[in-house]
Structure formats: structure tokens, C-alpha cells
């Protein structure tokens, strides 16, 4: 195929909206600074003579109209590097089995609200508690506490009560759908539920009503889980500022919850729901869980379907659970994971979990440099791992320009919301700081195409480097933001479990992360369960009214 003699290109092509006149050598010379390259005057003249054709190609694509947000690029990211077999896993158990023992159902409704999924599920099956009563407990807490927390965008009380009554009736008829049967939860407001507002946390979309239902919601519905409503999300999945408010940290109402799974972390930590759905592109589960004292599991890329969920970066977005206890993440992941034809990046790899299995003998990768600024709570986790019989293996990653891994995030997000920028609707966004999305989308238009491809090649290098490291260990242990591994592992697709840490046993002091091999979330859950039992046996409760 050639570009010569195209019959529709007689004369000067349409350069597209916003392009005034021909591209000149002087324009190209100024643009060279953006690309970090230099051409001669003669080269610039030759380029300028041929640029109209290139700009015309772009303009004709724009005239197609807005592309739907859920239309993924033709090239689909796979976390498993080509030629590599699946990593071994250390778990074989059924993640749907309720582990641990539940005592009597407490009389105090606050104690019920902060109970684990396993405890709630046991009480419901004993007949000590109904889903309808539990749902009402959470709805009352939302009514009372959300005016301070601003963690809910839409409360679906009527739908929740209908689901709760149906769950109770099904259980009474002998139909048990597993640990999540009758358990109330919140869904981050980038997740669609047909007929319900899904605002993406952004003013331009505040009146958007979903016309389809996300796969994750369909799967939770099938388990008779009860959706309480849509949790606050930083606008277009960044930060904790949404179109009406700033979601608050339940431990410090003067502070934002971080984000972008802002309301999911805040509401779960505050006992407004038993669990929630979050998402992460670059820190959006890990960061708010650290801030709010919640537990979060970012699954392997492709493990959980994104169909019916707002796309920010098609090759980076991941859906995962936020809970108050580690084993609860296993129950939720077991329900929502699995192959989905609606999501081209979805994969079908079995998920197993043995949370009660001892961690003795597990190989834990770490590096002293990762803990140079660590606090006592972080070092206590390392001590626990050693006492429990883990083999500590010092590891390191090669020196690479890891910041290049941000380029796909910038480019994909700007593409996902191109029309927002072109139509000047980005001006409607509440957060307009230099680091906020409106400015990031605008400057991403100046990423050179060659640089976008080269950054993707650096991403392949990162995948290979992580694969070599994970051949030596079963998991990595580190503070959440150490050594750039939050960025690296989001780019490579590796799973991460984040746990709250506490210096005094009653208030969160930060968080700790375990990074696992691809599709081996079960090992992370074993580790997290062991750390909880050894260091944090009590659920942290914010001092709310």
C-alpha cells in the first residue's frame, strides 16, 4: 500500500479544525524542543512540504466523531510476557470457603457494622442477622456520617432493600450463593448499573445515567450481594475531589481521603459498608487505603473484567476489592474474577486461596534501601515475616528510566477523553490545578508518537525485569510508595495487597504492601492474613460520632 496518487487529495488537504495555514519550518523548529530532537534547515523544509498530508490524516479521523469510551485500542496489553509460562502459585484452596470463627452476633449495631464479611456471613446463616437488617444498619450509618465524609455520590436505598429481601428469601429457600450472599457493598462511581446515575465524579458527566450494567455488578448480583450505592471517585479517577465535594479521611475530617477510590476506602474504613469496589490505574486503590486505614487488593491486570466500567487507560486499569480484613478480599475477588468476552483484556486463570495456611518457607523479596525511611510499624512487619519462618531474599531491579512508564498513562487517558478537551468541556472540571486532568490531557497532545512507542518498549523491559525478580521469590514486601514499584507494577500488571499499619494498635500509621507474582493473589492473602493475626488482630475504627 502506498500513499501516492490518492484520488481525494487534489490540492491542499483539510488541515483540520484549529490549524491556521500551512505548517512552516519555524513551527517545526519550535516543536523540536518537545521531542528532544534537532533537524537541519533543509530537513525542516522537506518535512514542512509534506506535513499537510499528515495533518489531513488526523483531521479526517477527527471528523468521524467521538469514539466511545469503552472502545479499546487494537493492541491489547497482556501482563504475561510472551514466551513465559504462568508463574507457579502457592495456594490451592477454595477462596469461597469462610475461614475463622465467628462468635455470637453482637447487640451493638456499630460492632455489627465493623464486622468482617466472614462474621457477617456466619451470623446471617445462623439466623442471628438478616441481610435486610444489615442493609438498614449500613444505610442509617450512611445517612448519619456521609454528610461529614462525602464518600457517597448516589445512594440506592430502595434497590438495596429489594436486593436484601431477595437475598433473605433465597437463603430461607435453601439457596446459598456463598460468602457474599446478603452482604452490602459500595461500588466506585465509574462502575455502571443500568438506570442508575454513573457520574465518573466529574461535572461534565454529573447527569450521566448508565444504559448497561458492568460485569462485576452482574457477578455480585449473582452472588446475592447488596449494592448500597455509588461511592465517591475523584473526577475521572484521579484524586479525592469530585464535582460536589472533597471525600474525607474518616480519621481526620480536615484531610482528603486520597484517591481515586476515595469513597470506597473512606466508606469501608468508616463502617458504612462491608466492602467496596475500587479501581487502580496508578495508586488509586493503594493510596486511599493507606490514608484511610483500609485493606485493598489490586488484582493482576486482566483478572477482573472492566466491561461497563469507565476507561481511563485501557492497558492499565484494574478493578479490585477494598475491605477491612485481608481474607475478605479473597471472597470478593473470587466472586468478580474470571474471563469475560465483553472485555478484550480479560483472561481466565483460576484463583485459589489458602488464607489459614502458614507462611513458613515463603521466599520474600526485599531491599534495605526500600526501608530507609520506614517507620517502626513497617519494620515490625519484616520482623513478623522472619519470625514466621519466611526466607528473606534481597532483590533489586535494574536502573531504567522508569518515569517513561507514565507516558502510556498520559497518552491513553488523553485519548479516552479527547472530546472533553476538544469541546472545552474540561473547563467544567472542579479541580483545575497544573497536576489535574484538564492540564494533563492538554499537554499529552504534545507527546511525540515515537516517544509513545519507545515508552511502550521500556514497559516491555520492565515486564522482563519483574519476571526475572519474581522467579526468585514468592512475593515482595515493602512500604507502599518505595522504589517506584507502585508505578512499575501497575505498568507490568502485577498484583498488590495493601494493609494498614498501626503504631498503637488503634489508629493507622500508614500502610504496607505485598507484591505478588502474576495471577498469584492467593500468596498475598496468606501473607496479609498472617500479618493481621500477628500484629493487627483488631479492626481499626475511626472515632466518628
Task: Describe every region a protein language model picked out.
Residues 106, 110-116, 146, 182, ...:
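Gly/Ser-rich, acidic/histidine-flanked active-site/gating loops
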Residues 127, 182, 188, 222, ...:
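Glycine-rich, small-residue loops and helix-cap segments
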Residues 39-282, 380-383, 388:
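Gly/Ser-rich catalytic/binding loops embedded in alpha/beta enzyme cores
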Residues 212-336, 479, 490, 494-513:
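Short glycine/serine-rich loop segments
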Residues 98-109, 180-200, 358-367, 407-463, ...:
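Short helix-loop capping/hinge segments that flank enzyme active sites or metal/cofactor-binding pockets
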Residues 128, 133-139, 165, 169, ...:
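Acyltransferase
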Residues 98-103, 298-379, 534-545:
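A short helix-breaking turn/cap at a secondary-structure junction
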Residues 21-49:
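Mature N-terminal segment immediately following signal peptide/propeptide cleavage
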Amino acid at each position: 500500500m502506498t500513499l501516492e496518487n490518492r484520488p481525494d487529495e487534489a490540492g491542499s488537504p483539510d488541515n483540520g479544525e484549529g490549524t491556521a495555514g500551512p505548517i512552516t519550518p519555524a513551527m517545526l523548529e519550535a516543536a523540536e524542543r518537545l521531542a528532544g530532537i534537532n533537524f537541519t534547515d533543509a530537513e525542516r523544509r522537506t518535512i514542512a512540504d509534506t506535513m499537510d498530508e499528515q495533518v489531513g490524516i488526523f483531521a479526517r479521523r477527527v471528523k468521524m466523531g467521538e469514539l466511545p469510551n469503552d472502545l479499546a485500542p487494537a493492541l491489547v496489553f497482556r501482563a504475561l510476557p510472551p514466551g513465559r509460562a504462568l508463574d507457579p502459585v502457592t495456594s490451592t484452596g477454595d477462596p469461597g470457603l469462610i475461614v475463622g470463627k465467628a462468635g455470637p452476633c453482637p447487640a451493638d449495631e456499630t460492632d455489627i457494622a465493623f464486622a468482617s464479611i466472614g462474621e457477617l456471613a456466619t451470623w446471617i446463616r445462623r439466623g442471628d442477622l438478616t441481610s435486610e437488617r444489615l442493609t438498614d444498619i449500613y444505610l442509617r450509618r450512611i445517612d448519619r456520617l456521609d454528610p461529614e465524609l462525602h464518600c457517597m455520590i448516589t445512594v440506592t436505598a430502595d434497590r438495596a432493600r429489594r436486593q436484601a429481601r431477595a437475598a433473605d428469601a433465597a437463603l430461607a429457600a435453601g439457596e446459598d450463593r456463598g460468602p457474599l450472599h446478603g452482604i452490602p457493598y459500595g461500588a466506585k462511581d465509574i462502575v455502571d448499573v443500568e438506570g442508575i446515575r454513573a457520574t465518573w465524579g466529574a461535572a461534565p458527566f454529573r447527569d450521566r445515567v448508565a444504559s448497561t450494567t458492568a460485569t462485576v455488578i452482574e457477578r455480585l448480583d449473582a452472588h446475592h450481594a447488596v449494592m448500597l450505592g455509588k461511592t465517591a471517585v475523584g473526577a475521572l479517577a484521579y484524586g479525592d475531589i469530585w464535582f460536589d465535594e472533597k471525600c474525607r479521611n474518616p480519621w481526620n475530617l480536615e484531610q482528603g481521603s486520597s484517591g481515586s477510590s476515595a469513597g470506597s476506602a473512606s466508606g469501608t474504613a468508616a463502617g458504612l459498608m462491608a466492602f467496596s469496589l475500587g479501581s487502580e490505574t496508578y495508586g488509586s486503590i493503594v493510596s486511599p487505603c493507606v490514608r484511610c486505614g483500609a485493606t485493598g487488593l489490586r488484582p493482576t491486570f486482566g483478572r477482573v473484567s472492566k466491561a461497563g466500567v469507565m476507561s481511563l487507560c485501557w492497558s492499565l486499569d484494574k478493578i479490585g476489592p477494598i475491605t477491612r480484613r485481608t481474607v475478605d478480599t479473597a471472597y470478593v475477588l473470587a466472586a468478580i474474577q474470571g474471563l469475560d468476552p465483553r472485555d478484550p483484556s480479560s483472561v481466565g486463570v483460576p484463583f485459589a486461596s489458602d488464607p489459614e495456611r502458614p507462611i513458613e518457607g515463603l521466599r520474600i523479596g526485599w531491599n534495605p534501601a526500600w526501608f530507609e525511611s520506614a517507620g517502626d510499624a513497617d519494620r515490625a512487619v519484616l520482623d513478623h515475616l522472619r519470625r514466621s519462618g519466611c526466607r528473606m531474599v534481597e532483590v533489586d531491579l535494574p536502573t531504567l528510566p522508569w518515569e517513561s512508564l507514565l507516558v502510556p498513562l498520559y497518552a491513553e487517558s488523553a485519548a479516552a477523553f479527547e472530546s472533553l478537551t476538544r469541546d472545552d468541556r474540561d473547563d467544567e472540571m472542579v479541580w483545575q490545578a497544573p497536576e489535574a486532568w484538564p492540564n494533563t490531557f492538554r499537554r499529552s497532545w504534545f507527546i511525540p508518537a515515537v516517544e509513545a512507542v519507545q515508552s511502550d518498549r521500556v514497559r516491555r523491559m520492565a515486564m522482563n525485569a519483574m519476571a526475572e525478580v519474581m522467579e526468585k521469590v514468592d512475593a515482595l514486601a515493602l512500604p507502599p510508595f518505595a522504589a517506584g514499584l507502585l508505578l512499575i507494577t501497575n505498568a507490568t500488571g502485577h498484583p498488590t495487597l495493601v494493609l494498614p499499619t498501626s503504631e498503637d494498635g488503634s489508629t493507622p500509621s500508614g500502610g504496607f504492601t505485598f507484591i505478588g507474582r502474576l495471577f498469584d493473589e492467593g500468596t498475598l492473602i496468606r501473607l496479609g492474613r498472617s500479618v493481621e493475626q500477628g500484629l493487627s488482630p483488631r479492626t481499626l475504627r475511626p472515632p466518628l460520632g
